[in-house]
Amino acid sequence: MTLEITRSELIKSKLIDAPERCGVYRMFDVNKQVIYVGKAKNLKKRLTHYIKSDLDNKTLRMIANTCFLEYSITNSEVEALLLEAQLIKKFQPKFNILLKDDKSFPFIKLRLDHDFPQLLKYRGKTLNDGKCFGPFASATEVNTTLTELQKIFKLRSCTDNYFNSRTRPCMQYEIKRCYAPCVGKINKEDYRDLVAQVKDFLQGRTKALQENLSKKMEELSSQMRFEEAAEIRDRIKALSYVQLKSCVSDIVKDADIIVVVEKNGHYCVEVFLYRAWQACGNIPYFPTSTENSTKEEVLEYFLLQFYQKQQVPAEIIINHEINDKENMIEAIKKINNITKLNIIIPISGGKAKLVQNAAIKALFSLEQYLKKFVKNQEIMLEIKALFGLHEIPERIEIYDNSHIQGKFAVGVVVVVGKAGFDKKEYRVFSLSSCDASLSSHAYPFSPRNLIAGSSTLTNPMDPVVRSREDDTSSTHNYAVGDDYEMLRQVLIRRLTRLKNEPHKLPSLMIIDGGKGHLGIVKEVMDKFAMHIPFVCMSKGVDRNAGIEQFHMTGKEVFTLDTNLPIMKYLQILRDEAHNFAIKNHRLGRSRAIKISSLDNIEGVGETRKKALLHYFGSYKAVCDATIDELTKVNGINKSLAAMIFRTLHKR
């Protein structure tokens, strides 16, 4: 019996009991990984579709990979939509249309739980301690707006701990970006007036704001308070300048314009944000697994996934019809706990013109993406031929480590896929926190065997994405130059994880190293009984970039012409891993230095160290503090404060 018949029989067996009701079904592969999630108004009718003979290639591949099938009945189509969206978000099935870059947009937040509210950049759910304005399409746009606001209104941006510890104005006051409320340079009433002006500006009430400021300027002038009047005049000028630079719309107040475009089977969905009559930027998305999909399907999947994480405006403007729009609206409203939402496709007028322009920009974004995609695919074909791979690599992992004479050691994995570097898949290994007893070679897969003899790494199945806070917490240092042991530990931990995540197995591993590293990789691969292709890339005898050597099992060492595009590409991969390793090593080292500087002061134990950091808010603030400021911390007397000051200022 063929594979296709077997899979078809599996679906037929499920059809016997499948009800003619709405619900969600899930397909699993041989490893019990969810490979597809779908919804249906009628489960029996929908599953019958998969035993037809005229299926497209993507659906045939999906069915060929299906070993198990489950379905869940829902009370309504809206509930089915919601469940489907939740399962797609949770499992990220490879045959579903996926929105890979789902990070939340940044906001400008005005904290209102303090006598002198703070203005800051913010990501995440809206909290009760302030008011959020936005969203903005990028952190750059938020930072630019914050800088302009600080120049115009001079509200504080510092943390509460820093604010409470000040006895004199900081640099922000000196460069005229803060009124220094921390030391009483402005009273609460005047500061609250500035806060109200910031709210007006961010809510788009700029005309009314400028009128109020003009009246205030005239009042101050009539009272002979010319310096204050001049300051208001400068604020009005600055507001006018910011308005000229910003894209103000008199057509759309609060809306997202979302357009979908297609070229050569690839799709781009671009989102244009409008809030308070102003354009807040745009960002393109390139959904995956869109083969044999329609614009309707891509847009539907995008909307459900996008609005699970992003703030929903009063109106969503799209350029293409979607199926069952009313149920989509109800699903998005339930996800975000809102009562009003409108999804429209404008036919004529100003909104239609905005949509047309948005589609033109989206098509340009897609063309730029395709250029990069095609170039990347060409390089992947060359890599397949160069290293004798059986298929075009879809996922390449590059390994490197960084340390100083064995101290503060970190290992990293950098991942590159079809569309370039996939930074969400980057991983950092805090090698310093692992006991050297891992080199006892007790590998295979049970956690107990993996750490035989180890007393410090109590749970080797912990995620390999080590939190950066953990990177410098240990005392273990490696023997000088012991790169082999570091690589061994990284591979043990990585392959242990990959055993449990077979869908993330790389097509190729590239290790920054030479012949000795090659032996370590082969040894660990054999112990794990895994057969992932790998190659070691070294800088040659004199360690010079440009004469790289490649080491592979069963092959002679070889080099490539430095002018070849594939050579330059491999150097870019190696350099990305190298830079990522150095960045994380320096981060850990700087934390260790900061903590040890306080640890080395006689009379400063763990309790006093915590008290100092809690009072001042950061290590830098402790360093900036005067002796008098240090004495305000509980447990720090005058003589100890002087010792802390002298020690920190010797560095």
Curated annotation (Swiss-Prot):
Residue stretches making up the GIY-YIG domain: 20-97
Pfam families: GIY-YIG, HHH_5, UVR, UvrC_RNaseH, UvrC_RNaseH_dom
SMART domains: GIYc, HhH1
GO process terms (BP): nucleotide-excision repair; SOS response
Subcellular locations according to the entry: Cytoplasm
GO cellular component, one term: cytoplasm
Subunit structure comment from the entry: Interacts with UvrB in an incision complex.
Family membership noted in the UniProt record: Belongs to the UvrC family.
NCBIfam families: uvrC
PANTHER family: UVRABC SYSTEM PROTEIN C (PTHR30562:SF1), UVRC/OXIDOREDUCTASE (PTHR30562)
Protein name from the UniProt record: UvrABC system protein C
Encoding gene per record: uvrC
